[in-house]
Amino acid sequence: MENKETFAFNADIQQLMSLIINTFYSNKEIFLRELISNASDALDKIRYEAITEPEKLKTKPELFIRLIPDKANNTLTIENSGIGMTKADLVNNLGTIARSGTKAFMEALQAGGDISMIGQFGVGFYSAYLVADSVTVVSKHNDDEQYVWESAAGGSFTVQKDDKYEPLGRGTRIILHLKEDQGEYLEERRLKDLVKKHSEFISFPIELAVEKTHEREVTESEDEEEKKADEKAEEKEGEEKKEGEEKKEGEEEKKEKTGKTKKVQEVTREWEQLNKQKPLWMRKPEEVTEEEYASFYKSLSNDWEEHLAVKHFSVEGQLEFKALLFVPKRAPFDLFETRKKRNNIKLYVRRVFIMDDCEDIIPEWLNFVKGVVDSEDLPLNISRESLQQNKILKVIRKNLVKKCLEMFAEIEEKKENYAKFYEQFSKNLKLGIHEDSANRAKIAELLRFHSSKSGEDMVSFKEYVDRMKEGQKDIYYITGESRQTVANSPFLEKLTKKGYEVLYMTDPIDEYAVQQLKEFDNHKLRCCTKEGLEIDESEEEKKKFEELKAEFEPLLKLIKEVLHDKVDKVVLSNRITDSPCVLVTTEFGWSANMERIMKAQALRDNSMTSYMVSKKTMEVNGHHSIMIEIKNKAAVDKSDKTVKDLIWLLYDTALLTSGFSLEEPTQFAARIHRMIKLGLSIDDDEEAKDDDLPPLEEVEGAADEASKMEEVD
């Protein structure tokens, strides 16, 4: 036996080990990820060498990683059949020569970095001391004999030729002598969970030694023989052969010879493969079945349903990576929960899990897409949890967005599937319109809306444009609280009578989306409730409109005088046919619906609200009997109290029908009551109560004051 040699750790390594041992880290579990990752690297190396020299695999043909928990001795063994280490490798790699990243890692650690970054500096092996008092490494390289490396991290380590442990053939066995309080890492469930969490997609089988209890029926004489055999381990194999021979003789014959039988339990150790989910993304898409995709998706997402769509692709060129993306059938209830840690895209480098919360890998509007991205050469810096070059990420991100849009277009081909998809994720698409300027036009093609002509179906912008009226330039839409509300809106009266189709946008996020989406296929999007609406009219219609405008000019001036600064201007309308009047907003200000949405924001910016709330324009229908009668009354006496009351009443009703909220509901009710009394010819005794109402001028002043108060609120 070769003498044991003692070596001193390099100063930096000694300092690093001291830091690991004497500092408390909550996530000690990362040691297993690091050791499995190192084992995978060792297996990659021998597999690579065997491409040109196949005989190198003969010393141990199987490629595997094995975990062996031993509760009796309080040890956890991580074994692999990789390339192994020579004596020189053990001395140099595990102690005397510090890697370039050792110092940098300690600096990062002392600056508040995470212990889980250790593997990025090439010193992941030392994470073993997070859970172990001492570590034994047994290794066999094809070019050397089997050696043992041992250290209790006391500043030195020993190396000697091995004559104690079972021959490996080739590979490395790391034996962790666990600290007293780290027994959890001997539990079968804990080890399985850790492998599933961090190392499920390592491309080599990870096997766990598990104890299985089997019950079998034996004769009493057999039982006695087996008890004797248990005392001599080397005779066990012979006993099993004997048992096999006896089974062949038949149960009946055994019963005759030996009499009674009884059931006994025996415990055997078996290898259970933990990473059964093979990396599907490494295979060609045409080789993977739908069942495999479904199984993989469920394993990845913990979803109880199968996926709705899948995209399996690889990118080569500036950056090489493979990816597998899934669209779920339903959105999670907390899809837009801002505090939730995102973990939908898992990032791997050469099948080693790096992170699942990389915010830069996919935009927020695609946060429902689940999947895996695996790069062969993605550069990393301090940790597996932080990436070094944003340029690389931008390439990955750009490709993922492109492929997601392709996947959505594929879903679109099946109307029933797309209806399910759109019901669940339409808000995400609209958020994409708002946030993703580069892909806005493509996302717009995916949007669907109900319309004045679509009935229960939904229509796309493309379908709308294809069936536009001859000569129609703009795409008309209306925003509102519900389909029923917008369908009955006075703003649609003229458009629908002339046969124009109007899109109904009733989702609050539609307001934000159309602010960014100005046009589709060179057709401007035009809101029916705002100024600037152009409806094609004949020359005769235009002439009649101008004549009517001149006729109503005195009334329009009177309405502006009465309403004062409640409206910016009063004009004759060419957009309504059945309603007496409506209130429209400026083209670039908030619509009535947007105003309603913003007022509901608990944390709204009131200064912004007062700035964006548009000055309203009152549009009067010159063909409506009410407006004609008021015009006639005003021509007789423009200071008539009833005329002024009616103007205020029309303003309040226009607020409601145009989608605004009432500014003074009490005063509105008072005016209604006054009109009711007038209609019922209430006598003078009741009229006294009317005197309690403030005069119109005061009502107007109170409204102004309330408006100011709302701005301050």
Curated annotation (Swiss-Prot):
Q: Which domain of life is it from?
A: Eukaryota
The protein's location, in the record's own words, is: Cytoplasm
Chief location of this protein? cytoplasm
Binding annotation for ATP: 38, 125, 384
Provide this UniProt record's keywords sorted from A to Z: ATP-binding, Chaperone, Cytoplasm, Nucleotide-binding, Stress response
The terms under GO molecular function for this entry are: ATP binding; ATP hydrolysis activity; ATP-dependent protein folding chaperone; unfolded protein binding
* Classification via PROSITE patterns: HSP90 (PS00298)
Q: Write down any Gene Ontology CC term.
A: cytoplasm
Task: List the InterPro entries.
Answer: HATPase_C_sf, Heat_shock_protein_90_CS, HSP90_C, Hsp90_fam, Hsp90_N, Ribosomal_Su5_D2-typ_SF
Q: Which SMART domains match?
A: HATPase_c
Which residue ranges have biased composition labelled Basic and acidic residues?
A: 226-264
In this chain, the stretch annotated as Disordered covers 212-264, 685-713
Please name the Pfam families in this protein's record: HATPase_c (PF02518), HSP90 (PF00183)
Q: Which Gene3D superfamilies match?
A: 3.30.230.80, 3.40.50.11260, Heat shock protein 90, C-terminal domain, Histidine kinase-like ATPase, C-terminal domain
What spans are recorded as compositionally biased (Acidic residues)?
Answer: 685-703
Q: Where is this motif: TPR repeat-binding?
A: 709-713
Q: How does it assemble?
A: Homodimer.
* Similarity comment: family membership: Belongs to the heat shock protein 90 family.
* HAMAP family referenced in this protein's UniProt entry, alphabetically: HSP90
What is this protein's function per UniProt?
Molecular chaperone that promotes the maturation, structural maintenance and proper regulation of specific target proteins involved for instance in cell cycle control and signal transduction. Undergoes a functional cycle that is linked to its ATPase activity. This cycle probably induces conformational changes in the client proteins, thereby causing their activation. Interacts dynamically with various co-chaperones that modulate its substrate recognition, ATPase cycle and chaperone function.
Per the entry's comment, what about the domains? The TPR repeat-binding motif mediates interaction with TPR repeat-containing proteins.
Protein name (record): Heat shock protein 90
